[in-house]
């Protein structure tokens, strides 16, 4: 309704009864009255508009929030690479886990909330469109860490599927602040993980985590987040962990693949028994065989390239890690180069698979934080209770070069002309720099519930045995799955809105 509009039924008749001059005066008076009423309404509603703006964009709630910025410095010089800097890798674990008898109370779970509240009346249509674009396309991987007093969405006691070595609170870690830091991209918000939204987006689909023990770390984080709204059914076996959510027919799976490429132990050339051989140009056949069963795959690898292995390319031995018996022959490929080749191999093979059209997410190198030495030379992350402050990121030459080779291998695969539109289903989840700040998120010496474990440095300053590679749960690793959910949302909703879909 237009403000101060005259009632047509009476006013129109009245005007026609007056002479022309009188009717003109009447119109003038009516227009003046309309202007006064409209101006009064604007003055009256201004405070209300301010209140609405304050409600949606309140600033006092962020006054006490601490921000730790992730600062990208392209001029950083990586330190020399040494295989001794590589972190330890746990032995391949068995997948035949028994279904935990966990209980959950939905009243204690803080899930991401969706609201039907309208936007402030001060936001124009163009501004709304700009905000939607930013929310959909913004860079998730450059931003800052901020302290969130709400804390995590689960506890070590509310998730029965937790590898004990990552159960930091259960293992006696005295501080808990590391659980409260959340990631904030520079251009948008990364929503809290919403388990119900995830299960609805993935309805009838399967998400698989494929990789080493750090991939298991991420998979267990995903399970802990989902377990808060529904207890799944264990449908796994020794070859593959599988958890089924009845309400939405969603399956979460995990496959162990140390290197993501074909491996074998039989003698090859001058490489005898007792050492693992890797065909860098052949994908792990178990992954390829299982691919048609998956709709989304989260890949990760790299840390096993610190272990002893032989590298084979084009059916020729070209290098090795901690192995090269014939010093008279030159090595063509080291473990860093081998890692990059393996990434390109598996990404191309998945993208070209005739029976796999799913979304592939490659999570980049997960940084370790062995400070003062390597994992086997006195490196430590003991006593770290919050993220590194802005600008204080400690460079690690091995981390930087491994991340570079991984990203290069991915982009080479994506650039393959033979992939066509299938390259759009390949996503790089680049977490390395952001998580370089999270030296506080590792178990450190709190790797077991043993009350007699050593957690302090000895008289000679020697640190206790510790894990500065994997992540506490709950902890920073949960952010990875917030990113996974956002990538899935963008892909699925983008397909629904695409005319060609």
Swiss-Prot record:
Disordered: annotated segments: 69-131, 438-467
Biased segments, Basic and acidic residues type: 94-113, 449-459
Cellular component aspect of the GO annotation: Golgi trans cisterna; membrane
Alphabetized InterPro entries for the sequence: TBL, TBL_C, TBL_N
Cellular compartments annotated: Membrane
Keyword Transmembrane helix appears in the UniProt entry: yes
Record GO terms (molecular function): O-acetyltransferase activity
Its membrane topology: Single-pass type II membrane protein
Biological processes per GO annotation: leaf senescence
Motif GDS motif boundaries: 211-213
Motif (DCXHWCLPGXXDXWN motif): 467-481
TM regions (residue ranges): 25-45
Tissue distribution: Expressed in roots, cauline leaves and flowers.
Ranges of biased composition (kind: Low complexity): 78-89
Keywords: Membrane, Signal-anchor, Transmembrane, Transmembrane helix
Expression induction: By dark.
Biased composition (Polar residues): 114-124
Domain of life: Eukaryota
Additional detail: Contains 2 motifs that are conserved in esterases, but it is unlikely that this protein belongs to the catalytically active pectin esterases.
Homology family: Belongs to the PC-esterase family. TBL subfamily.
Functional summary from the UniProt entry: May act as a bridging protein that binds pectin and other cell wall polysaccharides. Probably involved in maintaining esterification of pectins. May be involved in the specific O-acetylation of cell wall polymers.
Protein name from the UniProt record: Protein YLS7
Native source organism of the sequence: Arabidopsis thaliana (Mouse-ear cress)
Annotated gene: YLS7
């Amino acid at each position: 309704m237009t403000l101060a509009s005259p009632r047509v039924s009476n006013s129109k008749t009245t005007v026609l009864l007056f002479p022309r001059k009188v009717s003109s005066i009447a119109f003038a008076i009516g227009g003046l009255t309309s202007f006064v009423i409209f101006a009064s309404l604007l003055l009256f509603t201004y405070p209300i508009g301010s209140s609405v703006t304050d409600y949606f964009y309140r600033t006092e709630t962020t006054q006490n929030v601490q921000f730790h910025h992730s600062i990208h410095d392209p001029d950083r010089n990586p330190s020399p690479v040494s295989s001794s800097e590589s972190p330890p890798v746990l032995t391949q674990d068995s997948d035949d886990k028994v279904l935990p008898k966990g209980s959950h109370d939905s009243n204690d779970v803080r899930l991401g909330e969706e609201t039907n509240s309208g936007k402030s009346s001060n936001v124009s249509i163009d501004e709304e469109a700009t905000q939607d674009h930013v929310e959909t396309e913004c860079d998730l991987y450059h931003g800052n860490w901020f302290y969130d007093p709400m804390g995590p969405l689960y506890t070590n006691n509310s998730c029965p599927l937790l590898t004990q070595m990552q159960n930091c609170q259960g293992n006696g870690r005295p501080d808990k602040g590391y659980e409260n830091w959340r990631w904030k991209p520079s251009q948008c918000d990364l929503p809290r993980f919403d388990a119900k939204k995830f299960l609805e987006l993935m309805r009838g689909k399967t998400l698989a985590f494929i990789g080493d023990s750090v991939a298991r770390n991420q998979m267990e984080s995903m399970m802990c987040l989902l377990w808060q709204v529904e207890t799944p059914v264990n449908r796994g076996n020794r070859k593959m962990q599988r958890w089924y959510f009845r309400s939405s027919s969603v399956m979460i799976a995990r496959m162990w693949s140390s290197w993501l490429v074909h491996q074998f132990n039989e003698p090859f050339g001058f490489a005898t028994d007792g050492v693992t051989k890797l065909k860098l140009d052949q994908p792990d056949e178990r992954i390829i065989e299982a691919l048609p069963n998956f709709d989304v795959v989260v890949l990760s690898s790299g840390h096993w390239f610190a272990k002893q292995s032989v590298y084979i390319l084009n059916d020729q031995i070209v290098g090795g890690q901690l192995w090269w018996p014939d010093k008279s022959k030159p090595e063509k490929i080291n473990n860093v180069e081998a890692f990059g080749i393996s990434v390109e191999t598996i990404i191309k093979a998945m993208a070209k698979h005739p029976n796999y059209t799913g979304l592939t997410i490659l999570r980049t190198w997960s940084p370790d934080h062995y400070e003062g030495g390597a994992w086997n030379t006195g490196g430590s992350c003991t006593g770290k209770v919050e993220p590194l402050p802005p600008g204080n990121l400690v460079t690690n030459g091995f981390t930087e070069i491994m991340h570079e080779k991984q990203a290069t291998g991915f982009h080479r695969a994506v650039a393959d002309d033979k992939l066509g539109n299938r390259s759009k289903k390949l996503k790089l989840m680049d977490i390395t720099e952001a998580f370089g700040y999270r030296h506080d998120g590792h178990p450190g010496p709190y790797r077991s519930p043993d009350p007699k474990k050593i957690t302090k440095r000895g008289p000679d300053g020697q640190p206790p045995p510790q894990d500065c590679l994997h992540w506490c749960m709950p902890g920073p690793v949960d952010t990875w799955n917030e990113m996974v959910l956002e990538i899935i949302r963008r892909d699925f909703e983008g397909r629904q809105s695409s005319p060609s879909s």
